[in-house]
């Protein structure tokens, strides 16, 4: 749970046994993938020029490409979803491989910016007016584990998101990111739950989403809390984790969500289907 090579290998090996499921999975980066410096020592620093952060980014990007590299597309300079992720990464494969095998500050600099430039990735609608998925990186640039949970959606990434949505003006969208946009209007057990976990610029990002909120739904994880609601006109779905904080013998659950487009071309959430998982 810290973006390590063995963890990614175990995940990909498990997924390889379920090709039909793998073909439907969409991955996005979370803070444990890229921002946990040392699980055993939360105060350990990862200096801005250290190759450690860049290495975790390349592992994450490589895993994402292994799962969906031929299905998702990156945004070109005109705002159009163009090359697939695998095509976009092809010119950098040697640099990524050399860095992964040998490390070093110079090799880290050779892939600087590559991770951020791929977001948002877009799974385009399969037909005009269909449903697409915009996949965002919401992880802030942090350098030690105490601040690993901070979230931020950059202005550059937001502009690319807006351009992609404008390029497909009749389509509807799931906007998928790891961090929650704002604090939920509900009591919490500890004050610490309200510190440094939502997007730093969440209010700003929500305002930017309002212009296409009638044809989008925001989905996120991070806090693993069961919550569905709105902020302004934006519809927001928080995904409860069926494993985080659950005892092995406890009954857990997840939701299957269905969406419909009304005659007014607005995207609506239908009542979700709750799927319960029996304890072991």
Q: Can you annotate each of these PLM segments?
A:
Residues 1-4, 34-38, 142-144, 182-186, ...:
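Short catalytic/ligand-binding loop motif for oxyanion handling, primarily in non-cytosolic enzymes
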């Amino acid at each position: 749970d810290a973006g390590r090579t063995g963890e990614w290998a175990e995940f990909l090996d498990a997924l390889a046994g379920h090709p039909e499921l793998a073909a439907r999975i969409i991955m996005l980066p979370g803070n444990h993938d890229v921002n946990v410096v040392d699980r055993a020592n939360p105060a350990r620093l990862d200096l801005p020029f250290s190759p450690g952060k860049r290495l975790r980014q390349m592992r994450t990007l490589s895993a994402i490409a292994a799962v969906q590299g031929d299905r998702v597309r990156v945004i070109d300079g005109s705002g159009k979803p163009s090359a697939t992720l695998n095509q976009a990464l092809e010119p950098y494969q040697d640099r990524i491989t050399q860095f992964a095998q040998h490390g070093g500050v110079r090799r880290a600099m050779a892939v600087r910016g590559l991770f951020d430039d791929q977001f948002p990735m877009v799974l385009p609608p399969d037909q005009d007016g269909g449903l697409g998925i915009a996949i965002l990186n919401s992880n802030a640039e942090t350098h030690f584990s105490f601040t690993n949970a901070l979230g931020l959606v950059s202005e550059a990434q937001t502009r690319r998101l807006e351009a992609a949505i404008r390029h497909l003006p009749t389509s509807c969208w799931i906007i998928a990111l790891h961090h929650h946009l704002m604090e939920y209007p509900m009591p919490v057990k500890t004050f610490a739950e309200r510190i440094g976990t939502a997007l730093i610029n969440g209010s700003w990002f929500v305002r930017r989403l309002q212009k296409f909120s009638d044809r989008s739904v925001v989905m996120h994880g991070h806090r693993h809390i069961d919550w569905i609601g709105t902020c302004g006109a934006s519809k927001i779905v928080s995904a409860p984790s069926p494993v985080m904080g659950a005892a092995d013998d406890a009954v857990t659950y997840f939701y299957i969500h269905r969406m419909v487009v009304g005659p007014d071309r607005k995207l609506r959430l239908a009542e979700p289907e709750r799927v319960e998982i029996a304890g072991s």
